Design a protein with these regions (language model features):
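N-terminal membrane-anchoring alpha-helices
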Residues: 1-10
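N-terminal cap/lid segment of alpha/beta-hydrolase-fold proteins
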Residues: 9-52
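Alpha/beta-hydrolase superfamily serine-hydrolase fold, recognizing
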Residues: 38, 45, 50, 66, ...
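Short beta-strand element of the alpha/beta-hydrolase
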Residues: 51-62
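Short Gly/charged-rich anion-binding patches and loops
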Residues: 55, 73, 115
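The serine-hydrolase catalytic nucleophile loop
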Residues: 64-76, 90
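Catalytic nucleophile-loop/oxyanion-hole region of alpha/beta-hydrolase
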Residues: 67-70, 93-120
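Conserved alpha/beta-hydrolase
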Residues: 77-97
Length: 120
């Protein structure tokens, strides 16, 4: 039996997920009211016109996931349709701050979304 490691998964990057030729992405972060860093990825249509306002959608992830998974796919597809989208790692998950890791605290999560609106 041969055992191997998928390098992209082992390194924690998202090279194995869907990418669009019509969307630019940028890794960003901001702080919530608890001074915790919230990690996120901004998705912008490549045809974005400077100075024009665009509709925006903030995309969270399901429990047990991170922004690179389904939230990133939804954010990409919405950006292909002309939306500015922001996929975030909720506090205690992924690249966001918070201990203990993987905690479920909906009151903090709601503040993450509020801070995401302020960021946009």
């Amino acid at each position: 039996m041969i055992l191997g490691t998928n390098t992209s998964v082992a390194q924690g990057d998202a090279d194995n997920f869907y990418k669009s030729n019509s969307v630019n992405t940028e890794k960003v972060s901001f702080s919530n009211q608890y001074k915790m860093k919230v990690g996120a990825r901004l998705f912008l249509p490549k045809e974005l016109e400077e100075g024009r306002k665009y509709p925006a959608v903030i995309v969270g992830h399901p429990m047990g996931a991170v922004k690179e998974q389904s939230a990133g796919l939804y954010a990409t597809k919405l950006a292909e349709c002309g939306f500015v989208t922001l996929a975030l790692d909720l506090s205690f998950w992924g690249e966001s701050d918070g201990e203990p890791r993987n905690a479920v605290l909906p009151d903090v999560y709601s503040e993450d979304f509020s801070a995401a609106v302020d960021f946009l």
